[in-house]
Amino acid sequence: MAGELKVLNALDSAKTQWYHFTAIVIAGMGFFTDAYDLFSISLVTKLLGRIYYFNPASKSPGSLPPNVSAAVNGVAFCGTLAGQLFFGWLGDKMGRKKVYGMTLMLMVICCLASGLSFGSSAKGVMATLCFFRFWLGFGIGGDYPLSATIMSEYANKRTRGAFIAAVFAMQGFGNLTGGIVAIIVSAAFKARFDAPAYRDDRAGSTVPQADYAWRIVLMFGAIPALLTYYWRMKMPETARYTALVAKNAKQAAADMTQVLNVEIVEEQEKADEVARREQFGLFSRQFLRRHGRHLLGTTVCWFVLDIAFYSSNLFQKDIYTAVQWLPKADTMSALEEMFKISRAQTLVALCGTIPGYWFTVFFIDIIGRFVIQLGGFFFMTAFMLGLAVPYHHWTTPGNHIGFVVMYAFTFFFANFGPNSTTFIVPAEIFPARLRSTCHGISAAAGKAGAIVGSFGFLYAAQSTDASKTDAGYPPGIGVRNSLFFLAGCNVIGFFFTFLVPESKGKSLEELSGENEDDDDVPEAPSTADHRTAPAPPA
């Protein structure tokens, strides 16, 4: 049995020590960069529209055409989806460590290249931006399954959830840093190159130097990724991959002897026995019987969660404008608009996003993944309905702060809820040789949801009145009806959570069935051994 391997028992029972925190920082900085890169584009899209699609005859500032806006906002998600599938599969074939370095260098190169452009025409700049952001997303996609898998395989079973959640929580700091960098850059440029509002001077409201501002914001994301490359390459391969997949238990024991500072002598025969017994593939009947409903649960929950999460997150600036929390665009210069959009996103990250992530870190190994995910979907539904039902009340003068508070609570329960748990659980419940692949499939389903949100919300949230839509967009269903739709997505996630097992306090081998003989596995998982919700107290 896998559970008889001394090296895995040593990892499961290890006390929390320095190498755990080192792994959190190394893996977490990748997610810091991921979040910074994916969300920073929403801070500069209005500026891009003013610079490259300026029309002197228009009463409103230039904006990205619908197809260009959809491409700029969504192309990184397309790359991320492809990267999650490809690097997730590759991580199980080549090893976590080897592939980890590839993804990071791809992120660094494409992050820097995102700020470059071929020519100065709108078409040339947008084509360059979309090309490099696709490949940036491809690298980011690999970071999802690999970071989660590496952290889960390094962690002890008592605090594994908190460690994986801490890696994911670095996204919150990535969002916050993106807003802060954009605030500093826009404020510095505005102080040096001040400009009048658009309605006072249409051409003069966007100074030529503003073209550098968005490039600096996007390129800054390469710095934290570059700083962690050396340390990623120094990490040894995870013991679970080396012993259970590469079938070299002695090397796994040697690696973990250095990490844990204890002497571990492993018997190769035990690892060979596990490898002989655990040979079924992803598309086999045995995988379907053991893990089919689990994979369905993780993919559907992540898919519907990301529809709601990314459609709201990417277009915060449009929602703020709708409730008049931001001034009208023609009353601001280009850099002033960038500053105020960045300030709004920074406040939401600080008040609604970061606290939710760290609540998950502190409570996930106490109350479990199931309760947090179920509760998160429930409260997201409640708060979105609370925004949608009295939507006209929230958009009247004097009620805007209440809207923002409700919106912040929605994000709090997304992050102290399914946005964290959908990342954590797939790294725990699948066999070692398929763990990275299954996490990549689950994450790719999430990014498919993000694509639906980021492309579809551009059109769906448009006013039903054709005279009030953004330039180039057909009438949509409006923000209010969009919020009803997103609440419905959360309801679906609530019910599919019941397909996902509770993983608190169990070893990875116990959860994946690698401790069981094939003959011991029932056709349908029993209630006692594969309980979805925690058992009630006796």
Swiss-Prot record:
It comes from Oryza sativa subsp. indica (Rice). It is found in: Membrane. It is a multi-pass membrane protein. High-affinity transporter for external inorganic phosphate. Residues 507-538 are annotated as: Disordered. Residues 511-522 have a biased composition (Acidic residues). This is Probable inorganic phosphate transporter 1-4. GO terms for cellular component: membrane. It comes from the Eukaryota. Although related to the sugar transporter family, it does not transport sugars.
